[in-house]
Swiss-Prot record:
It comes from Borreliella burgdorferi (strain ZS7). Belongs to the DnaA family. PANTHER family: CHROMOSOMAL REPLICATION INITIATOR PROTEIN DNAA. This is Chromosomal replication initiator protein DnaA. Gene3D superfamilies: 1.10.1750.10, 1.10.8.60, 3.30.300.180, P-loop containing nucleotide triphosphate hydrolases. Residues 360-487 are annotated as: Domain IV, binds dsDNA. It is found in: Cytoplasm. InterPro entries: AAA+_ATPase (IPR003593), Chromosome_initiator_DnaA (IPR001957), Chromosome_initiator_DnaA-like (IPR020591), Chromosome_initiator_DnaA_CS (IPR018312), DnaA_C (IPR013159), DnaA_dom (IPR013317), DnaA_N_dom (IPR024633), DnaA_N_sf (IPR038454). HAMAP family: DnaA_bact. The gene is dnaA. Residues 143-359 are annotated as: Domain III, AAA+ region.
Length: 487
């Protein structure tokens, strides 16, 4: 019996942290511990109305608290059976508990009269009415851009699965692919698809609350809510949605506080069959400094990647962009852009925009020489502004600098030597390739002497940890990265 009382007290303590004084008073002040039978703890409510309301609002939260504290088999049962009228003092070894149950004993007397029950019910109804008045009548989604649609998304072999899944989610949110994580490199169309999901769902399901937000905005909003003591308002905003779309989830790496908040938000929405969609620049297994339990949540549903577009898709993208911008140039010029710019969709569109600028501002005829110049500018800009060049020259540069600085050979780095200094060099090589290229862990493994995905992932995580804990290692990695960037 005492254990059951302690469990109920724990639940009250945890719930009180998340509610205002008014809320806690309305919902929990008039509850009484009744009895425990096996794994069931019976709690008396003043009336049937109160029982139904508290089950609707707090069953899920109570279950979370029980699981979090290792009471997986315990079930809280609410009943409108009145408390026993005899004294039944509930003494425990915990003074705080004794005070709590002393209050409950007094409540047993005052909650049995019809007048008291009616007062409690009236107060709850007033509170519900107040809540409804505070709810926004028109839910706004400021970050959804109407220009992103499924209709203007160009489909190819590299993105077809992601496209089909996204469209399916829009038609039946919370059903088939929940959660969904779309991953791939920069500028490949992840944001376009994520925003399209929001726009199409809004079009098909007018009454749903849909929110698109970047991971950075999610973080900033959370930090601001802590500063202004409005975390409750933050939780209410995100945990009562019908669809949550978070872009660039990798930006939350190394940020434990917001990961904890996202974990609880995820659980609240998922358990209520609300749709969750995320984008990321890598697969969940390759996320570093992310809690395992959050990564496991991402893999519950569908994980689908978008790879780099092939030539046919690049050509289609360039043609469509040229048509939208009203550019009339020979097809061989557009094909040259598609052939040379292989990085991503964003760079292809940037090349076409530059073509338009030359035509509109300089009033000149576009020829192959100008196209070559534009492409060269884009490729140079890409190298200067991203840590993800993905071509043979850059990989070779990384390797060359690593071998020179660590004074090792090609045979060392690609062989099977177990010497500590060689093993360390391989870990560093994997880490540098992961940070400076778009290569997957499998592709990195092939470069480093046929290592497996898990081996490469271990190397990356190890260097990540060592940089935080070992100043010498951190300085070495920083120096290597600076030399690679300069080169």
């Amino acid at each position: 019996m005492e254990k059951s009382k302690n469990i109920w007290s724990l639940i009250l303590t945890e719930i009180k942290k998340e509610l205002s004084e008014e809320e806690f008073y309305v919902w929990f002040e008039n509850l009484c511990f009744l009895e425990s039978i096996g794994d069931n703890i019976k709690i008396s409510t003043p009336n049937l109305f109160h029982k139904n309301q508290i089950e609707k609002r707090f069953t899920k939260k109570i279950k979370e608290i029980l699981i979090k504290n290792g009471y997986n088999n315990i079930v809280i049962v609410f009943t409108n059976q009145p408390p026993k009228t005899h004294s039944n003092k509930q003494e425990t070894k915990n003074p705080a508990l004794n005070e709590t149950f002393s209050k409950f004993d007094k409540l047993k007397e005052k909650t049995t009269s019809k007048e008291a029950i009616q007062n409690i019910q009236d107060r709850i109804k007033m509170y519900i009415k107040k809540e409804e008045e505070e709810e926004p009548t028109n839910f706004k989604n400021p970050f959804l851009k109407k220009r992103y649609t499924f209709e203007n998304f160009i489909i190819g072999p590299n993105n077809k699965l992601a496209y089909n899944a996204s469209l399916s989610i829009s038609k039946n949110p919370g059903k088939k692919y929940n959660p969904c994580l779309i991953y791939g490199g920069v500028g490949l169309g992840k944001t376009h698809l994520l925003q399209s999901i929001g726009n199409k769902t809004e079009e098909l399901h007018h009454n749903l609350k849909i929110l698109y937000v970047t991971a950075e905005n999610f973080l900033n909003e959370f930090v601001e809510s802590i500063k202004t003591h409005e975390t409750k308002k933050f939780k209410k905003k995100y945990r009562y949605l019908d669809m949550l779309l978070i872009d660039d989830i990798h930006d939350l790496q190394k940020k434990e506080g917001i990961q904890e908040e996202l974990f609880h938000t995820f659980n609240a929405l998922y358990e209520d069959n609300k749709q969750l969609v995320f984008t990321c620049d890598r697969s969940p297994s390759e996320l570093t400094n992310f809690t395992d339990r959050l990564k496991s949540r991402f893999t519950r549903g569908l994980n689908v990647d978008i790879s780099k577009p092939n030539f046919e898709l690049r050509a289609a993208i360039v043609e469509k962009k040229a048509e939208e911008d009203g550019i009339n140039v020979p097809k061989n010029i557009l094909n040259l852009v598609a052939q040379k710019v292989t990085t991503n969709v964003r760079d292809l569109e940037a090349a076409v925009t530059k073509l338009k600028a030359y035509i509109d501002l300089d009033n000149i005829e576009i020829d192959i020489e100008i196209v070559e110049k534009i492409i060269k500018e884009i490729i140079i800009y890409e190298k200067e502004t991203t840590n993800e060049p993905n071509n043979k020259i850059n990989i070779e540069n990384i390797k060359k600098i690593l071998l020179r600085e660590l004074k090792i050979t090609h045979k060392d780095i690609e062989g099977h030597s177990k010497k500590p200094e060689i093993t360390k060099a391989r870990h560093i090589y994997a880490y540098l390739l992961r940070n400076f290229t778009e290569l997957s862990t499998v592709e990195i493994g092939k470069i480093i002497g046929g290592k497996t995905h898990s081996t490469v992932l271990y190397s990356i995580n190890k260097i990540d940890r060592d940089r935080n804990n070992d100043k010498e290692i951190n300085n070495l990695i920083t120096e290597l990265m600076n030399k690679i960037k300069k080169n």
